[in-house]
Design a protein with these regions (language model features):
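Domain-terminus/edge residues, biased toward the C-terminal soluble/receptor-binding domains
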Residues: 1, 168-172, 180-269
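N-terminal export and membrane-targeting signals
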Residues: 2-6
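Bacterial N-terminal signal peptides
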Residues: 8-18
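Non-catalytic interaction/Regulatory regions outside core domains
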Residues: 13, 22-23, 240
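A residue-identity detector for tryptophan
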Residues: 20, 108, 260-263
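Domain-scale selection of a single, long terminal region
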Residues: 21-22, 269
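Active-site-adjacent loops and short helices of periplasmic peptidoglycan-processing enzymes
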Residues: 23-189, 196-200
Length: 269
């Protein structure tokens, strides 16, 4: 279901001919060869999804889509915006990978997926980033949000201002990790805009999304993006589970990167 591929194929046909007659007068030029018929554009694939979009990163052209502006629950795809802001802070010199962050009770008590950071213990920004991206740890994500903005509520305001700047018109964030909330929503189109901005603005940090595993506190966890193992053309970004199961990935075909965002019809069994 994840491996529907869309590729563009270009080709050129070159025909060259020269003819000289034995007589002094030159033969008239041959009529130009007829241009080959245009390649038909394939129809969009049948995908078991409520909403999806496939966008060419280089041109921002939408290659295929279904209900791409329908409002969806982002779940842990929210962490893409949190990471985007963390990378902003790093690039601007306001944050360093070696900075230490003391884990608050709010971060430590967070629900859902965890990096298993310890209450009151300092953790490096580097390890928190790995915990957020590789393990999808809500605790690591909230710790980073609090380090940048003081509180998670204030950080959500920063998320929404960035969403507005990126023209994510169908998105509103209420927290940094993606825990359910009535006014916490996005669209497949908006997530494709965020994915493209991530790759474009912070290529030096995008490598985090291809790391396969991370160990913290003696607990080793695999990257939750199973496409890294299943498809060698996928170089990163994020799945989201459990409800609704969704993903944002960056497959590369013929040296071309695409942003692929989808929400499944039903949660996995």
């Amino acid at each position: 279901m994840y491996r529907h591929l869309i590729a563009s194929i270009s080709f050129a046909t070159l025909i060259a001919a020269a003819c000289w007659a034995a007589a002094p007068a030159a033969a008239p030029p041959a009529a130009p060869a007829a241009a080959p018929p245009a390649m038909p554009i394939p129809s969009a694939p049948q995908v078991d999804a409520r909403s999806y979009i496939l966008v060419d990163y280089q041109t921002d052209k939408i290659l295929a889509a279904k209900e791409a502006t329908a409002r969806m629950e982002p779940a842990s795809l929210t962490k893409l915006m949190t990471a985007y802001i963390v990378f902003q802070e790093l690039a601007g010199g306001k944050l360093k990978l070696e900075d230490m962050v003391t884990v608050s009770e709010h971060a430590w008590r967070s629900e859902g997926s965890r990096t298993f950071i310890e209450l009151g213990k300092p953790v490096s920004v580097q390890d928190l980033i790995l915990g957020m991206i590789v393990q999808s740890g809500n605790d690591a994500t909230i710790a980073l949000a609090e380090r940048i903005a003081g509180t998670e509520d204030t950080f959500a305001q920063l998320m929404n201002s960035n969403a507005k700047r990126l023209n994510m018109v169908g998105t509103h964030f209420e927290n940094s990790s993606g825990l359910p909330s009535p006014q916490h929503y996005t669209t497949a189109r908006d997530m494709s805009l965020l994915a493209n901005a991530m790759i474009r603005d912070f290529p030096q940090y995008y490598k985090y999304y291809s790391i396969r595993e991370f160990e913290h506190n003696g607990i080793k966890q695999q990257n939750r993006n199973g496409l890294l193992e299943k498809d060698p053309s996928v170089d990163g970004l994020k799945p989201a589970t459990p409800i609704p199961p969704a993903s944002v990935s960056s497959p590369r075909r013929i040296a071309r990167a695409c942003a692929w965002c989808r929400w499944c019809s039903d949660p996995p069994a």
